């Protein structure tokens, strides 16, 4: 009796499950139609799945910008193309003349820069304020000008006579202290004179003082631009 009852219940379950299966099978064609339409729409808008959307620069890269010459097949073709792109070849005399012209042009520019012409100066040296600072520095004797000669002399003596190093070190320290004091005095003097001569100046005293100290630390003959005033001259 239990087996018969079990079979009946199993049969009822099959009967109950058959309409559900039929309903599922009946829904499959509709789902297939909707999924097919969705994928077709997606492929039209976003492209195939699994690939990133191309960026604007990548899409432009693939577009043709114009006719492209074919690549050379031999070394002779490559040489011919390089010659055609390089233009006409200059002779030896023409190259020498071009080098001489460039050298003369550079020499002229340097001479005008050393003479202090405003159009050929470096950006740090341009302007009437910087010119006035240079004149102030060039019109006085500066202890900072001894920096390079004293440093070179110290190095030479230390390598030639190492025993004198013990006596030269304190002397160099004293000289460095004096040069520092001279740089401070020069910076204050330059700032005061610039404020008097150029009341509308907007450049800070600190920058002008550094510019003056840097020029004063150079040897007079090597200063660029060249000094326009003599030592002890009146700069106004």
UniProtKB/Swiss-Prot annotation:
Stretches with biased composition (Basic and acidic residues): 13-31, 90-108
Main location: membrane
Region Disordered, residue ranges: 1-108
Annotated TM spans: 142-162, 166-186
Ranges of compositional bias, category Basic residues: 1-12, 52-65
Annotated Low complexity bias: 32-47, 67-78
Membrane topology: Multi-pass membrane protein
Gene Ontology process terms (BP): symbiont-mediated evasion of host immune response
Location in or out of the cell: Cell membrane
GO CC terms of this entry: plasma membrane
Keyword vocabulary terms for this entry: Cell membrane, Membrane, Transmembrane, Transmembrane helix
InterPro entries: DUF3043 (IPR021403)
Protein name, entry field: Uncharacterized protein Rv2206
Source organism: Mycobacterium tuberculosis (strain ATCC 25618 / H37Rv)
């Amino acid at each position: 009796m239990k087996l018969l009852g079990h079979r009946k219940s199993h049969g009822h379950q099959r009967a109950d499950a058959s309409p559900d299966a039929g309903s599922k099978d009946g829904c499959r064609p509709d789902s297939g139609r909707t999924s097919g339409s969705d994928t077709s729409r997606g492929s039209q808008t976003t492209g195939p799945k699994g690939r990133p959307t191309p960026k604007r620069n990548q899409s432009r890269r693939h577009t043709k910008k114009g006719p492209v010459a074919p690549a050379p097949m031999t070394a002779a073709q490559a040489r011919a193309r390089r010659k055609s792109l390089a233009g006409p070849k200059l002779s030896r005399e023409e190259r020498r003349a071009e080098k001489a012209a460039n050298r003369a042009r550079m020499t002229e520019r340097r001479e005008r820069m050393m003479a202090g012409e405003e159009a050929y100066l470096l950006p740090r040296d341009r302007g009437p304020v910087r010119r006035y600072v240079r004149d102030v520095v060039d019109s006085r004797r500066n202890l900072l000008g001894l920096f390079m000669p004293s440093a070179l002399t110290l190095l030479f003596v230390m390598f030639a006579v190492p025993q004198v190093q013990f006596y030269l070190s304190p002397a160099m320290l004293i000289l460095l202290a004096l040069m520092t004091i001279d740089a401070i005095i020069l910076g204050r003097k330059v700032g005061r004179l610039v404020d008097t001569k150029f009341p509308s100046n907007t450049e800070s005293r600190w920058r002008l003082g550094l510019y003056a100290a840097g020029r004063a630390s150079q040897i007079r003959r090597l200063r660029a631009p060249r000094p326009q005033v003599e030592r002890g001259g009146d700069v106004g």
